[in-house]
C-alpha cells in the first residue's frame, strides 16, 4: 500500500528523479520559461516553489540550503538577488503551468512552466 506517499515516480529511480528535477529547476530559474511534459511540470512545482520561498529571506544558511538543493552557484545568486525580492509580497503561487498540446513523436501532453510576473520581451512593438 502506498498510503501517504506523495509525489509521482515518472518511471525513474529516485536518484534519476532527483537529478532531473534539480536540472529542470535550474533551467526554469535561468530562463524563467521552459517547456516539458505535463506530469513533470506539475511535479516541478513541488521542487521550485519552496526554493523561491527560501530565497525571500536572504541569509547565509538559506543560501547554503539552496545550493545544497540546486548545486548551481549562478542559480543561487539569481534566486536571492532577483527572484526573492521580486516575490517578497506574494504568498506562494510563483509558477504558472500552461498546457501546450501534444508532442509529435509520442503524443505526450506538453506544458510550459513559467515564473509569474516575469518580464516579457515583446518583439512585436
Swiss-Prot record:
GO terms of molecular function: structural constituent of ribosome
Top-level taxon: Bacteria
Keywords: Ribonucleoprotein, Ribosomal protein
Biological process annotations from GO: translation
Family to which the UniProt record says this protein belongs: Belongs to the bacterial ribosomal protein bL17 family.
PANTHER family according to UniProt: LARGE RIBOSOMAL SUBUNIT PROTEIN BL17M, RIBOSOMAL PROTEIN L17
Assembly, per entry: Part of the 50S ribosomal subunit. Contacts protein L32.
NCBIfam families named in the record: L17
The protein, known as: Large ribosomal subunit protein bL17
Organism field: Acinetobacter baumannii (strain ATCC 17978 / DSM 105126 / CIP 53.77 / LMG 1025 / NCDC KC755 / 5377)
Gene name, Swiss-Prot/TrEMBL: rplQ
Amino acid at each position: 500500500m502506498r498510503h501517504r506517499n506523495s509525489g509521482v515516480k515518472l518511471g525513474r529511480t529516485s536518484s534519476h528523479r532527483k537529478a532531473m528535477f534539480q536540472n529542470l529547476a535550474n533551467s526554469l530559474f535561468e530562463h524563467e520559461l521552459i517547456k516539458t511534459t505535463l506530469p513533470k511540470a506539475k511535479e516541478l512545482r513541488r521542487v521550485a516553489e519552496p526554493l523561491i520561498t527560501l530565497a525571500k529571506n536572504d541569509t547565509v544558511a538559506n543560501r547554503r540550503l539552496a545550493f545544497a538543493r540546486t548545486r548551481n552557484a549562478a542559480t543561487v545568486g539569481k534566486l536571492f538577488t532577483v527572484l526573492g525580492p521580486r516575490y517578497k509580497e506574494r504568498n506562494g503561487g510563483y509558477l504558472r503551468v500552461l498546457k501546450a498540446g501534444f508532442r509529435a513523436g509520442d503524443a505526450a501532453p506538453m506544458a510550459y512552466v513559467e515564473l509569474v510576473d516575469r518580464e516579457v520581451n515583446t518583439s512585436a512593438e
